[in-house]
Each structure stands twice: as C-alpha cells, then as structure tokens.
A protein has these predicted regions:
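Catalytic glycan-binding domains that act on GlcNAc-containing polysaccharides
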Residues: 1-187
Length: 187
C-alpha cells in the first residue's frame, strides 16, 4: 500500500512530469558517497532550484543545491577540491549533498532539523530549539512536528514541509516506498 495516492497510469504520469529526476547520475553518486537517500536529495533540489543549474536566489544562493558561496567554499575545502565551479551540476550536487549530510550528523541525525538548517542556518535552528523548549516548558526531545510549528520564519517552516512532501513523492514514484513512512522517517 502507498497511502491514498491513486496509482493510475495517467495520474502517475502527471506526478512523474511534476517530479522529474534530472541530474540523476550526479545525485545518485553524491547520495551514495555521503549516505543520503536519493529521494531526499531529489526533493531538496526540486524545492531549491527545480533542477536549474544556473539559478541564483535573491540572497545569492547558487546552482542546483542553492548553496551560498561561503558554504560552497567551506565544503570544497573540506573535500579538498581545487577550483570548484558552483554552477557545475556534479560539483554543486556533490557539495550540497555533503553539506546536508553534515547537517544531519550535527543535528542529532534529524532530517527535519537538517532541512531547517539548510534553509536558515544551523545557528538559528539551535537557537529556535532552545527557545522552543524553554517557551513550552520542555527541556528535551521536543517532537519535530511540534518544533516545526514554533519556527518563527514562515519561509523555513514551509521549506521543510515542501522538501519532505517532495521526498515522499519521489520515494513513492521511483523507489516503491510508502510516502507516509518517508514523512515519518524525516520528521
């Protein structure tokens, strides 16, 4: 069973057109290298750039993974890359996946916290966690879905929801995973 999604051929084709797997080779390689699910990175990249390798945000984030240049440089240095190009799809995906993987590890192996940090930065996420726990009278293990509602920046709240939704649909469409399970795993 795959939840309530209709698996008819027409609906499936519409979903596949809406959730393409552009740059799959690059995403697959980086996902394997940094132990991240392909569907997580597909969801992140779809949300960040809709697979446009030369897009630049109003805040200066660039490429498929929408990395800020300072983050891109830090990741390139850690991986000992010489003269990396931020708009090169393979390089951008590799460094974006590396960065996301590191955020997951730094934030208690939590996909949702890593997504919030990918969008707003790890310092803000740690601050929000601390103030949310204090504000709600909780001192440990604040449930992720409750934490999501306490984030003061709507862009980050919505970003987390969009990436999780996209990852769940990719998992269902291409990896025969139950989307409800993916949402639960990521939360």
């Amino acid at each position: 069973k795959t939840g309530n999604l209709d698996n008819s051929k027409l609906n499936r084709k519409v979903f596949e057109l809406s959730y393409p797997r552009n740059f799959l080779k690059e995403i697959s390689l980086a996902s394997k290298e940094f132990d991240v699910e392909e569907y997580d990175m597909l969801g992140l990249i779809r949300t960040e750039s809709f697979f446009n390798p030369i897009v630049e945000s109003s805040k200066g984030a660039m490429g498929l993974s929408q990395l800020m240049y300072t983050t891109f440089e830090e990741c390139a240095t850690k991986l000992k890359l010489e003269n990396p190009n931020i708009t090169d799809p393979a390089t951008n995906v590799r460094l974006g996946t590396f960065y996301y993987s590191n955020l997951v590890k730094r934030l208690n192996n939590s996909d949702i916290l890593a997504l919030f940090a990918y969008n707003a930065g790890p310092t803000k996420v740690r601050r929000w966690l601390k103030t949310s726990k204090v504000g709600l009278g909780l001192y440990k293990n604040l449930p992720s879905d409750l934490f999501l509602e306490t984030i003061p920046i709507s862009e980050t709240r919505n970003y987390g929801r969009k990436v999780i939704q996209s990852a769940a649909l990719y998992a269902w469409l291409y990896y025969e995973q139950n989307p409800c399970d993916i949402v639960n795993e990521m939360m």
